[in-house]
Design a protein with these regions (language model features):
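Peri-transmembrane interface segments
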Residues: 2-10, 76-77, 123, 128, ...
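Hydrophobic alpha-helical transmembrane segments of multi-pass inner-membrane transport and secretion
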Residues: 9-12, 125-152, 424-459, 482-491, ...
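Membrane-interface junction motifs in transport/secretion proteins
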Residues: 151, 155-187, 203
Length: 563
C-alpha cells in the first residue's frame, strides 16, 4: 500500500470510509435493523462517488494528453475517473426513480394508476417486459446522444483547426492574379469595426525536395510582423523552442548557421524531442581554407517554415536544406526552365490537420515575391475578425470599405462550404438513422401496454363500472407508456451525458499516428441533448396511442365476462 501514489491512497481511504459510514448510518436509522434495497443502493452510490472524487483529483496531477508519452497507468486513471463518474450518475438516477414514482402516485387518477402499474412487482413476466422496454429506450437514447456528441466534437475540432490556420476573411482577385496596391486595402480593412488583424500574402504551388524525397507543397509568403494577428502559426511551431520568437530563424536566417547544440530541431510522433547535438571539433590547420569555410559555416539560405508531416516526408529537421522547384521559371534556349532555389528549414509547425502539415510551407513575403517574380505584389489579403461565427456579417462591410469591383471578399464558411455542408448532412443523417433505434424500442412499449391491457382487463372493467370514462383510461395507459419511455430516456441521456462529459474532461487518448489527433474530441451541447430527449419522448408518446385506445375501447362486460 505504501508504494501507491498519494492520490490513489487518499481515494481508496475516502471510498471505504464513505461507504462504511453510510452503511452504519442506514443501519442506525433503520428501526428493524435491516438494510433495504434503496439503502444499499444509496450506500453504493456514495462509495462510487468517493472513488470518482479520488480519480478526478488524481487526473489533475497527470501530464496533459497533448505532447506527453503514453503510459498505461495514466490511461487506467483516466478510465477509472470516467467509469466511476458514469456509475455514480446512473446510480443516482436509479435511486431517484422510486421518489419520482411516489410523486406521480400523489397526482391525478391517471398518473396514480399508471405509476402503480409500472412499479408492480407481482406481474412477473410483465415486469420483465417493462424492464426490457426501459432498457431498449435507454440504449437507443444513449447511442444517439453519444454519437451526436462525438460527431459534434469532430466538427468543432475541425472548425477550430481551420480557423486557427486560415483567415476568417480572404480578399483576392476574381482572376486569382497578383495585385500591387494592397497597402491601401489593408488600411481600409483595418478601419472596419470588428476587424482585429489583416496581413498580405503571396501563394504559389511548387515542388519541395530534399536529398531523400520530394513532395508537392503550397508556399505562403507572409509578413512575420502581422501574421500572428490573423493565424496561429507562432503558437503551432513546435521546433525550435529555445528562441523567444518562434519565427526568429525565419526573419534572421543567418541564425541558422549557428544553432545551439541543445536546440530542439524536431519532434517525434510520441512527443520525443530531437536536439541538434554538439558542434564538430575544431578543424586542423592543414585543411584547405575553402573546404574549411564550407564545413565551418553552412551557406546562408532563406528560411522556410514547414509542417511536421512534410518534415517526415522529406526527412529534414531545423537547419537542413530544402529545394523548391517551380514550373513557372525563366525562358531559356530550351523553352521555359523550372526555377529552383534552396532554402533552410527555419521552423517546424504542427497544426493538427494532416492536409496542412504535409502541404503548407511559409517564407517571408519579400522572399516569396522574389521567387514568384511578383515584386511589390500579393495574391491575397488575410483578415481576422473578433467573432469568427459572424464573419459573414462583416463581409459586406469589408466590401463597402475597399470599394473595389475587381476584388472579391469571401469568409471562411464560403471557402469551406462543401466541407461543412457535408458535415451537416452527415450529422442530420446520423440523427435520423439512430432515431430508428428509438422507434424500434418504442415497439416494446406498445407490446408492454397491450400485455398490460390483457392482464388488467378485469381492473379496467371495474374502473369503468365505477364511473371511469374512456378518456381517463386512455390517459392512464398513455401516461404509463410515457413513464416507461421517460425512465428509459432519462437513463440513456443521463448516461450519455455523464460519459461524454467525462471523456471531454479527462480525455480518451488516441494514437496520433493513426487518427492524427491525440484524444477523442467530444462536444457536449445542451441543445443536442434537449433535442434527443424531446425526440425520444415524442416517439414514445406516439407509440402509446394505439394500445391506449385499445384499452379505452374495452367494454366492462368483456372484462368481467369470465369472472
Amino acid at each position: 500500500v505504501t508504494t501507491l501514489p498519494l492520490p490513489a491512497l487518499v481515494a481508496g481511504i475516502a471510498a471505504v470510509a464513505a461507504a462504511l459510514a453510510f452503511l452504519v448510518a442506514r443501519a442506525a436509522l433503520d428501526f428493524r435493523r435491516q438494510f433495504t434495497r434503496r439503502g444499499v443502493l444509496q450506500a453504493v452510490c456514495a462509495g462510487v462517488g468517493a472513488l470518482f472524487v479520488g480519480f478526478a483529483f488524481w487526473t489533475h496531477r497527470l501530464p496533459p494528453l497533448h505532447g506527453s508519452a503514453w503510459t498505461l497507468r495514466d490511461m487506467l486513471v483516466r478510465a477509472g475517473a470516467v467509469v466511476t463518474g458514469v456509475l455514480f450518475v446512473v446510480g443516482t438516477v436509479v435511486a431517484l426513480l422510486p421518489w419520482m414514482l411516489d410523486r406521480l402516485e400523489r397526482g391525478p387518477f391517471a398518473s396514480y394508476v399508471a405509476a402503480r402499474h409500472v412499479r408492480a412487482k407481482k406481474s412477473g413476466f410483465l415486469t420483465l417486459i417493462s424492464g426490457l422496454s426501459i432498457f431498449a429506450v435507454a440504449l437507443a437514447s444513449f447511442s444517439l446522444s453519444g454519437a451526436i456528441s462525438v460527431m459534434g466534437g469532430f466538427s468543432a475540432d475541425l472548425k477550430h483547426k481551420i480557423l486557427g490556420n486560415n483567415a476568417n476573411i480572404v480578399i483576392d482577385t476574381t482572376s486569382q492574379t497578383a495585385w500591387d496596391d494592397y497597402h491601401d486595402v489593408i488600411d481600409e480593412v483595418r478601419a472596419v469595426r470588428g476587424v482585429v488583424g489583416a496581413t498580405p500574402e503571396v501563394q504559389g504551388e511548387v515542388m519541395a525536395s530534399s536529398s531523400s524525397n520530394l513532395a508537392g507543397v503550397v508556399v505562403h509568403g507572409i509578413d512575420p510582423a502581422t501574421i500572428g494577428n490573423v493565424i496561429d502559426l507562432r503558437k503551432n511551431i513546435e521546433a525550435p523552442v529555445k528562441v523567444e520568437d518562434k519565427l526568429a530563424y525565419l526573419e534572421h536566417p543567418e541564425m541558422l548557421q549557428h544553432i545551439p547544440p541543445d536546440e530542439v530541431i524536431g519532434i517525434g510522433s510520441g512527443g520525443e524531442e530531437y536536439t541538434k547535438g554538439p558542434e564538430l571539433p575544431p578543424l586542423g590547420d592543414d585543411l584547405d581554407p575553402a573546404v574549411a569555410a564550407v564545413i565551418a559555416a553552412p551557406p546562408l539560405r532563406p528560411g522556410l517554415v514547414i509542417g511536421r508531416e512534410l518534415a517526415k516526408t522529406l526527412h529534414v529537421y531545423v537547419g537542413d536544406e530544402v529545394t523548391l522547384v517551380s514550373p513557372l521559371g525563366d525562358l531559356g534556349p530550351m523553352g521555359v526552365m523550372p526555377k529552383t532555389r534552396r532554402y533552410r528549414v527555419a521552423a517546424i509547425f504542427y497544426s493538427g490537420m494532416y492536409e496542412y502539415d504535409v502541404a503548407q510551407v511559409y517564407t517571408t513575403l519579400d522572399e516569396a515575391q522574389s521567387y514568384f517574380a511578383m515584386p511589390g505584389k500579393v495574391t491575397s489579403v488575410a483578415v481576422k475578425v473578433d467573432d469568427a461565427e459572424n464573419a459573414d456579417r462583416l463581409t459586406p462591410k469589408v466590401v463597402a470599405a475597399i470599394g473595389r469591383p475587381d476584388l472579391r471578399v469571401r469568409d471562411w464558411r464560403d471557402i469551406n462550404k462543401n466541407l461543412f455542408s457535408a458535415l451537416k448532412l452527415e450529422r442530420i443523417a446520423t440523427f435520423l438513422i439512430l432515431s430508428i433505434e428509438i422507434i424500434v424500442a418504442s415497439f416494446c412499449i406498445v407490446c408492454t401496454l397491450l400485455l398490460m391491457m390483457a392482464e388488467k382487463a378485469k381492473e379496467i372493467a371495474i374502473l369503468k363500472a365505477l364511473g371511469a370514462t374512456d378518456g381517463s383510461i386512455l390517459r392512464t395507459f398513455m401516461t404509463e407508456g410515457i413513464i416507461i419511455g421517460g425512465i428509459g430516456t432519462l437513463l440513456g441521456v443521463s448516461t450519455g451525458l455523464a460519459l461524454c462529459t467525462g471523456l471531454a474532461w479527462f480525455g480518451l487518448r488516441l494514437d496520433p499516428d493513426v487518427y492524427y489527433i491525440d484524444r477523442l474530441p467530444i462536444n457536449v451541447s445542451g441543445w443536442d441533448y434537449t433535442v434527443v430527449t424531446l425526440a425520444a419522448i415524442t416517439i414514445c408518446t406516439i407509440a402509446t396511442i394505439f394500445p391506449a385506445k385499445q384499452a379505452a375501447a374495452l367494454r366492462p362486460v368483456d372484462g368481467l365476462r369470465y369472472e
